């Protein structure tokens, strides 16, 4: 089995799991997985596809600039430049970007703070943080319609081989050293977003919550 086929299957499995959660509204979102380091190549979702379906045209191979590495009629997802920035600056092996109601709400509620902070939740251990009462922070950046501008702003928040950034009203982008790590971190962030949204609703209803 070639490395491209192996990575294709790995990314397809992640896509299927996220699709089962209904995290690909209206063809939104994009996923990628690194194939080679030198030269840098990675598989990324093709633009405009229904990601709830499995087809032979789900992904295409692109180079370090996010351009197709092989002849194809497919176009890479619009945010491929963000993936390229991550791979070019870290040892990440997988990047996942999804739009959910909860992550958009959190990005809107805390945009003025420039970040959202969560603490006191056991799920934080998913990030490898085991301290009692630990807190995690996720930066929130402005959403620029011009993707190169967005990529330049996004690049300021790429620190380490695993991380996450919220784009205001434009979803979350998570990366990890492996597809498993990226998916685990994405699931943990989405848990925290949903918990906070429900917590705020309960507080507004006057119910006693911490």
From Swiss-Prot:
**SMART domains associated with the record:** Aldolase_II (SM01007)
Leading EC class: lyase
Origin: domain of life: Bacteria
Range of residues in the leader sequence: none
GO CC field: cytoplasm
InterPro entries, sorted: Aldolase_II/adducin_N (IPR001303), Aldolase_II/adducin_N_sf (IPR036409), MethylthioRu-1-P_deHdtase_MtnB (IPR017714)
GO BP annotations of the record are:
L-methionine salvage from methylthioadenosine
UniProt EC number: 4.2.1.109
What positions does the entry give for Zn(2+) binding?
Answer: 97, 99
One family name in Pfam for this protein = Aldolase_II
- Annotated keywords: Amino-acid biosynthesis, Lyase, Metal-binding, Methionine biosynthesis, Zinc
For this chain, one GO molecular function annotation is: zinc ion binding
What does the UniProt record say this protein does?
A: Catalyzes the dehydration of methylthioribulose-1-phosphate (MTRu-1-P) into 2,3-diketo-5-methylthiopentyl-1-phosphate (DK-MTP-1-P).
What the record says about family reads: Belongs to the aldolase class II family. MtnB subfamily.
**Which HAMAP family does the record match to this protein?**
Salvage_MtnB (MF_01677)
Protein name according to UniProt:
Methylthioribulose-1-phosphate dehydratase
Say which species the protein is native to. Geobacillus kaustophilus (strain HTA426)
Please name the gene that encodes this protein: mtnB
């Amino acid at each position: 089995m070639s490395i491209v086929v192996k990575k294709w299957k790995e990314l397809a499995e992640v896509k299927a799991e996220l699709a089962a959660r209904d995290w690909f509204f209206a063809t939104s979102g994009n996923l990628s997985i690194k194939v080679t380091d030198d030269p840098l190549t990675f598989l990324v979702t093709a633009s405009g596809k229904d990601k709830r379906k499995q087809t032979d045209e789900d992904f295409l191979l692109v180079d370090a600039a996010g351009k197709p590495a092989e002849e194809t009629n497919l176009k890479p997802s619009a945010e491929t430049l963000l993936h390229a920035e991550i791979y070019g600056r870290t040892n990440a092996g997988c990047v996942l970007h999804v739009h959910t109601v909860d992550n958009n709400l959190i990005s809107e509620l805390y945009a003025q703070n420039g970040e959202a902070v969560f603490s006191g939740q056991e799920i934080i251990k998913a990030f490898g943080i085991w301290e009692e009462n630990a807190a995690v922070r996720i930066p929130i950046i402005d959403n620029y319609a011009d993707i190169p501008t967005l990529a330049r702003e996004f690049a300021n928040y790429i620190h380490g081989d695993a991380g996450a950034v919220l784009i205001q009203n434009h979803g979350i982008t998570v990366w990890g050293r492996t597809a498993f790590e990226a998916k685990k971190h994405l699931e943990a962030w989405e848990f925290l977003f949903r918990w906070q949204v429900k917590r705020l609703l309960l507080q507004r209803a006057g119910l006693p919550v911490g």
